[in-house]
């Protein structure tokens, strides 16, 4: 696959998830630790094989979200964000400081996509919730 991706100029993106939360739903999980995915990237040694850096999953499985991002940004093709622990909004009701994470991403010069896995909390207006998430990430 590496050769084909390189020939066609496409990037294969592997998403790291975690096997701690809802482990019964992830019985076939392969990429459940950041180190494992980074090891695959190093072993394959191609600029066309990278990681989807899912902030929610990295926090649950490994922690050190911004340090890990800084140390491995060259292996990241796409970033997912979601609140921890709820997997909902990325606002102040969650344990992560998303304005700081957003500034870190910008400071690293990341030019890929950052996607919010948007799932409003109970009773939240979906549009207002999404607007708030955009304001948080727009640095």
Where are these regions (language model features)?
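Internal active-site segments that recognize and position negatively charged phosphoryl groups
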Residues: 1
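Histidine-acidic metal/acid-base catalytic patches
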Residues: 7, 31-53, 57-139
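Active-site-proximal beta-alpha loop/turn segments in soluble metabolic enzymes
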Residues: 16-27
């Amino acid at each position: 696959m590496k050769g084909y991706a390189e020939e066609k100029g496409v990037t294969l993106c592997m998403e790291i998830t975690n096997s701690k939360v809802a482990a019964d739903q992830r019985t076939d999980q392969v990429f459940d630790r950041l180190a494992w995915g980074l090891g695959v990237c190093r072993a394959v040694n191609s600029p066309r094989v990278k990681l989807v850096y899912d902030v929610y999953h990295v926090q649950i499985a490994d922690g050190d979200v911004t340090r890990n991002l800084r140390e491995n940004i060259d292996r990241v093709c796409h970033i997912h964000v979601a609140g921890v622990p709820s997997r909902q909004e990325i606002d102040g009701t969650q344990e992560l400081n998303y304005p700081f994470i957003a500034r870190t991403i910008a400071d690293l010069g990341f030019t890929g996509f950052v996607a919010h896995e948007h799932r409003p909390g109970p009773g939240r207006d979906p549009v207002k919730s999404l607007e708030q998430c955009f304001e948080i990430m727009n640095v």
